[in-house]
Amino acid sequence: MRSPKVKFLTIFTLSILITKMSFASSACFNEAGTMFRIEPNLIKAIALVESNLKKDSIGKNRDKKNNIKSFDYGLMQINQMHIPMLKKRGIIKDERDLLDNPCLNIKIGTEILYKHFSRCGMTWQCLGTYNAGFAMDNQKKRLQYAKKIYIVYTRLNELDNRKALAK
């Protein structure tokens, strides 16, 4: 169990990160949640873990030899494998759209998560596929990722409850 001081610092740090979100981006999480029937705080937790809420974040995925194998873009760290289909559907022109339009990035990431939940059920193990994919040998990575999301998600809900009680 964490000490009260560590718990306070973690919650304090989370509250600072959440303050960084503009009203518009909070509205985007809510809108994406409504569109895909996924709780907005779960989406926010993913964005916090994936990019620390940095809309222009570009992640590099590396293989065991440290070679770059793919890139992830924006708040929700949309993997480049999705770009051809997003272009084909007319949703983006190129990966720059994933960096320049945080609301669009949130909605695309939420749609990807929705498709994963549709495939393997609304479970923490399935949520882990958002980051670690569906490969059988990635089960441990999926659970580790899901645990990170769960911790942040729980803290976001605690903050919301504190705000509600303070009113």
Swiss-Prot record:
UniProt KW keywords: Periplasm, Signal
InterPro entries documented for this protein: Lysozyme-like_dom_sf (IPR023346), Transglycosylase_SLT_dom_1 (IPR008258)
Domain of life: Bacteria
GO CC term, one of those recorded: periplasmic space
Subcellular location: Periplasm
The keyword Transcription regulation belongs to this UniProt entry's keyword annotation: no
Signal peptide, first to last residue: 1-24
CDD domains: LT_IagB-like
Pfam families the UniProt entry points to: SLT
Similarity remark: Belongs to the IagB/IpgF/P19 family.
Protein name: Peptidoglycan-binding-like protein
Organism: Escherichia coli O157:H7
GN (gene name): pbl
